[in-house]
């Protein structure tokens, strides 16, 4: 990366540190600089998306497709993958304007919540646990240095089955499950976690999900992503989605090979087929055989009540939060929260920008 590009990157970081400069940053269009300064990288992402998602006909029209991708970026900030997964490649300019892309969502939220606040309160898993521990429903410890071994050993020998997460893990990256039966195993796992001696980790008792949720896929903790909004008019939500992993996987993220399906916000009933990160569609879960459409999220009203309580008590200054919720035999617990992606648009190809803006700004 050139010195000029590094300087711009530093400037972008500084501008995001405060609410005032965040607004200036987006008002002057500095968010478009990465595409201009890192154009080779953007072109590679175009090629990767085309190879991954394009039809045979589209492969013969690469130049036109790339040109259209750039139009989508400048219109709604769509990245190359979103171009295909949202179905933007077949839409008019007017239809595309209805869709909420990741970048546009982060731009909007960046004007309301400084990025440092987002990173400290949401992305930092240890900080979030300290804030929301009453809603975790499981035992947890944090590992940052060698002095944390005793706490880790105590947890490991108490519950045996653990989920280990890097403090800033995203899309399931770096997360693994481990079973520990004795102190020797605890020491080995701790040394693996400590690795080079850097970084925080959060160690959680593995969730024992309810029988109904486990039926979808037993190896992963299957969850519901609930998108909640809090403004002066009250509490609202936009199309939640069910997330389930594949056989043998411990995570349910679409980015890690999982499958998701949209859920009716009022009834808790799944109303779309399942979709994976490649855009493949499934009437039934490929491993368990359970049909997605018509599947009822168990104890759905309890989950909504729990999310409402968390948002009002824990994050009252955040207009929008995406909550990952898991169901145990004792009730709903929170896995984590984030601003997340509106991948529900991939499943039904219905844009949710207007709805998002209405709830975020309380209009």
What is each stretch, according to the model?
Residues 142-146, 242, 321-324:
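Acidic carboxylate-rich catalytic motifs and surrounding loops in phosphoryl-/glycosyl-chemistry enzymes
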Residues 114-224, 232:
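Active-site nucleotide/adenylate-binding loops and adjacent lid/helix of ATP-dependent enzymes
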Residues 217, 221-305:
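ATP-dependent carboxylate/phosphate-activation module, predominantly the ATP-grasp catalytic core
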Residues 1-36:
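Intrinsically disordered, low-structural-confidence terminal and linker regions
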């Amino acid at each position: 990366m050139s010195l000029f590009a590094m300087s711009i990157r530093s400037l972008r970081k500084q501008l995001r540190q405060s609410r005032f400069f965040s607004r200036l940053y987006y008002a002057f269009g500095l968010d478009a600089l990465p595409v201009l300064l890192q154009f080779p990288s953007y072109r590679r992402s175009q090629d990767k998306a085309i190879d991954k998602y394009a039809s045979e006909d589209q492969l013969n029209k690469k130049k036109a497709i790339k040109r259209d991708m750039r139009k989508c970026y400048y219109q709604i900030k769509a990245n190359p993958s979103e171009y295909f997964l949202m179905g933007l490649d077949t839409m008019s300019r007017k239809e595309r304007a209805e869709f909420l892309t990741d970048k546009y969502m982060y731009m909007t939220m960046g004007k309301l919540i400084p990025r440092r606040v987002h990173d400290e309160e949401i992305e930092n898993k240890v900080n979030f646990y300290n804030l929301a521990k009453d809603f975790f429903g499981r035992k947890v410890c944090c590992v940052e240095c060698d002095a944390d071994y005793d706490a880790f050993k105590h947890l490991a020998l108490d519950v045996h089955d653990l989920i280990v997460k890097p403090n800033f893990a995203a899309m399931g990256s770096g997360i693994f499950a481990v079973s520990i039966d004795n102190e020797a195993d605890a020491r080995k796992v701790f040394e693996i976690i400590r690795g080079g001696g850097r970084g925080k980790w959060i160690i959680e008792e593995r969730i024992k999900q309810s029988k109904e949720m486990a039926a979808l896929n037993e190896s992963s903790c299957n969850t519901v992503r609930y998108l909640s909004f809090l403004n002066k008019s009250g509490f609202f939500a936009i199309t939640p989605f069910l997330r389930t992993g594949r056989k043998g996987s411990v995570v349910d993220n679409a980015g890690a090979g999982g499958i998701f399906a949209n859920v009716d916000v009022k009834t808790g009933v799944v109303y779309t087929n399942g979709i994976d990160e490649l855009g493949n569609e499934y009437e039934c879960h490929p491993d368990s055989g359970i049909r997605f459409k018509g599947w009822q999220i168990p104890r759905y009203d309890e989950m909504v009540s729990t999310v409402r309580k968390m948002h009002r008590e824990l994050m009252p200054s955040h207009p929008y939060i995406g909550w990952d919720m898991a169901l145990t035999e004792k009730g709903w617990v929170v896995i984590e929260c984030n601003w997340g992606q509106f991948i529900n648009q991939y499943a039904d190809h219905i844009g949710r920008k207007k709805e998002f803006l209405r709830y975020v700004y309380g209009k």
